[in-house]
A protein has these predicted regions:
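Bacterial N-terminal signal peptides that target proteins for export
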Residues: 2-14
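Residue-level micro-sites within transmembrane alpha helices that shape
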Residues: 6-7, 19, 227-228, 383, ...
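Bacterial N-terminal signal peptides
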Residues: 12-23
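Cleavable N-terminal signal peptides
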Residues: 16, 28-30
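Active-site mouth of glycoside hydrolases
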Residues: 32-279, 283-291, 297-313, 323-330, ...
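Carbohydrate-binding surfaces of carbohydrate-active enzymes
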Residues: 360, 375-398
Length: 398
């Protein structure tokens, strides 16, 4: 019987005490190597790795129980990758010197952005600069997520920030300096760029407080993303910022893949031509782009073909179709089959997997109605079956 790493360490520690000897306990390493690319495929240890999984937005601020429920449901779904972004970001801790531009004090469930006092970055009034919270309500939340994902054999795609202000993100960071410019200030102001670089370095070089593994050395991380949906304008600024920041990440961490995290629908994956990016990302919501399900299905094929032309993997890393649509089950079945059958499609991550909250209820999902739940319903069955077959997918020429 194979004993899990954490339990193995505990057993070793007990044995050392019983035998009255000093033991050197070496932290366990994640199983398997780092994810690589080969043409339009992701690979693991030289073999194709087809991405199947989901997004979850509260994994870095939900309670320990809420986080482990999501990860357990991901395992039940047969997922191999979960995507999230590091958040929240707030103003000054006194709440007044530099205001927080979103409702940090909300008492809502985690899924509805009740963060219960968690924050990663803040404005340090004493030092008049960005502060980083590495405590139990800060980066130790990320430590817990990574360690728990490893226990379950899950890989994580992690975006360093969110562009949007829902839990602060880049918008809170530009507000530290009094700016209201959402699309350019953060990406051009020397102070904001310095903050981002310091944050990236802090994360990459951090040693996990639970298992002792540095993030940049941890294969549990599937890939880093510069930001969730960096809506940078104009296009030349976007490309120059991506090139600069991706280069900085790789100068510190050559082990992991780097993606932009961009939605990339309107520009049709234009950033795939940036050499330093390892793979392409796109976020597909027919509702927001006024597309029929059939037109979106054709778009899947079109975007995977773009990947083939550039010889890079293309990942549909967000997509959703509201449960209020009577044909939701059939539409998901169609899209997932199209992705599965195309050898140039690298995989998919549905938006979004949610689990029981500490309130004992599932989130209300009254806004976009994209939530996926382990409720044994028809949608869950379709997604679960697609993930199971996708995780076992083999290419004809392998």
């Amino acid at each position: 019987m194979k004993i899990p790493g954490a339990r193995r360490i505990a057993i070793c520690a007990i044995l050392c005490l019983l035998m009255n000897v000093t033991c050197l306990i070496i932290p366990a390493k994640a199983e398997g190597g780092f994810i690589r690319t080969s043409g339009t495929r992701f690979t693991l240890d030289g073999k194709p790795f087809y991405v199947v999984g989901a997004n979850n937005h509260y994994l870095t601020f939900g309670s320990a129980r809420e986080v482990t429920r999501v990860l357990d449901d991901a395992v039940a779904m047969h997922a191999n990758v979960i995507r999230t972004f590091i958040q929240p970001v707030i103003g000054s801790l006194d709440g007044t010197t530099v205001p927080t531009i979103w409702d940090w004090k909300s008492k809502a469930d985690a899924s509805d952005l009740g963060v219960n006092g968690a924050y990663m970055l803040y404005w340090d009034t004493a030092r008049n600069r960005m502060g980083i919270n590495d405590g139990p309500d800060g980066l130790q939340r990320l430590d817990f997520l990574v360690a728990e994902a490893r226990k379950r054999g899950l890989r994580l795609i992690v975006a360093f920030l969110d562009f949007w202000a829902y839990t602060g993100g880049a918008q809170q960071m530009r507000a530290w300096y009094g700016s209201r410019d959402e699309n350019t200030f953060f990406f051009t102001d020397p102070r904001a760029k310095r903050d981002y670089l310091l944050w990236v370095r802090e994360v990459l070089t951090r040693t996990n407080s639970i298992d002792g593994i540095r993030y940049k050395d941890d294969p549990t991380i599937f890939a880093w993303e510069l930001m969730n949906e960096p809506n940078i304008r104009p296009e030349p600024l976007y490309r120059s910022w991506i090139e600069e920041m991706a280069g900085y990440i790789k100068s510190i961490d050559p082990n992991h893949l780097v993606g932009s995290g961009h939605a990339n629908v309107s520009n049709k994956l234009s950033d795939l031509s940036i050499p330093i990016l390892d793979f392409g990302t796109w976020h597909g919501y027919p509702l927001y782009y006024k597309l029929t399900p059939a037109r979106f299905d054709r778009l899947i094929t079109e975007f995977c073909e773009i990947g083939r032309r550039h010889q890079k993997p293309v990942l549909l890393e967000e997509f959703g179709f509201a449960r209020s649509n009577r044909d939701q089950v059939a539409v998901y079945r169609m899209w997932l089959k199209t992705l599965h059958d195309n050898p140039d499609c690298a995989g998919w991550l549905i938006w979004r997997l949610v689990s029981l909250q500490d309130s004992g209820r599932f989130p209300k999902d009254s806004h976009d109605q994209f939530d996926i739940r382990n409720d044994e319903g028809e949608v869950w069955a379709v997604v679960k079956d697609a993930a199971k077959s996708g995780a076992l997918r083999r290419y004809q020429n392998d």
